[in-house]
Amino acid sequence: MNKKITLALSALTLGALSVQAQTAPAPMPMPATPAPAAAPAPTGVQFYGWVEAGATLNSKQPKDRQNFGRLFDDRANEVMLNQVVLTAEQTLAGKPEEFQWGFKLQGMFGSDARFIHSLGLLDNASNKTLQPDVVEAYLNLHVPGLTAAGMDVKVGKFVTLEGAETIDPRTNPFYSHTYIFNFGIPFNHTGAVATLHATKEIDLMFGLVRGVNASLTDNNHSWSFHGGIGFMNLADGKLTGMFSTMIGPETPKDNKNFRYLHDLTFTYALSAKESLVTDLNYIQDDVGTKSKGYGIAEYYIYKVSDTLSVQVRGEIWKDKNGFFVAQFGNNDDVMNGLKGKAIRDPRTVGGGNTTYSAITVGLSFKPAVAKPLTGLTIRPELRYDRSSKTKAFVDSKHKSQLTFGVDAVLAF
């Protein structure tokens, strides 16, 4: 059992935006009236941050106090301080004909940090629920001349290109995350990735990274490819998309068997108030039985007003070999699994060979705030999860679970 749990924990490092399928995380699209021409990017160093807290009530009151298959909202019936984030950033100035440089340094303290650590960087800082982490620390360079818009090169630690959701809660429509975000994509990478702005419609991304959630140290001393292709301004500006991938050895102490993580995300504006987001995901690990996971998540977002939106998310994700989806009872289980260590907490279990389905309905309320605050978002949601074959939920005794969650994100 411990061996299987360790594999599942190693696979956890695939999870989530991401983070989001783009060179720099951008908000999950919300319908809006077309905006005027964009202002020049701010110059100089910008300082900003946010605080997020929330709670998830499980109707079946699990004795182990775990919401199976969840990460950032994993604790049942408990208030969580998810994130306290501070950021210093100098963005590129938006002048493609000039050489430019920028950077981003972002730190986090909170319960979410347990899941997004990278090897060798604060991964042993604490065994408490609230932990510190360096989310991003990179140098950004713009090189002109290769094309009309030039090329950007990011060097350091950064969030993944993959996925429709992000670590940053401000860019997500829901408090809870998909199985795709949690188990089907990485959270972060350390290395270098270049973005070639080939045309006004196409970006090409390519680079080498230390792997899934690996930073100053690596669990197999191998490099991986990370890249993709972005599509913009299609269908009269209504359609954007991104295919992203990561390929390389990811299992602890194994530099021969590859892991393949592919994600395809599309966003389509139905109208000024409505949009659809599609996230397709496939993951395979060649170690052992060649475990596979794959699925789709679909989002519908309706903007009622400038302060209120309604959103619905449906997802189906198959864990073909019972390798990827799990719950983690101990605060150190994720990092121990990433390092290839045995997991002994009996609350840390997988869900077996099954297909998961989930439907989530929620609101996003953004009331006005006074300076120096820059935003407040309150997101209540109702979510139903089901396993097709196994009793994965609620102390491993039920095939489904119903949860009500709510969080608040205060930005400054």
Summary of predicted features, one role per range:
Residues 1-70, 328, 339-347, 412:
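N-terminal periplasmic/intermembrane-space "pro-region" immediately following the signal or transit peptide
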Residues 24, 31-47, 60, 92-101, ...:
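Short loop/turn motifs that connect adjacent beta-strands in outer-membrane beta-barrel proteins
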Residues 49, 53, 81, 86-90, ...:
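Residues on the lipid-exposed face of transmembrane beta-strands in outer-membrane beta-barrel proteins
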Residues 59-78, 113-230, 240-247, 327, ...:
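Surface-exposed coil loops of outer-membrane beta-barrel proteins
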Residues 70-73, 113-116, 123-127, 166, ...:
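Outer-membrane beta-barrel pore domains
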Residues 71-112, 301-310, 317-319:
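Glycine- and aromatic-enriched membrane insertion/assembly motifs of diderm outer-membrane
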Residues 80-85, 100, 106, 132-136, ...:
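Transmembrane beta-barrel architecture of outer-membrane proteins
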Residues 96-97, 183-189, 214-222, 251-258, ...:
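Solvent-exposed loop/turn segments connecting transmembrane beta-strands
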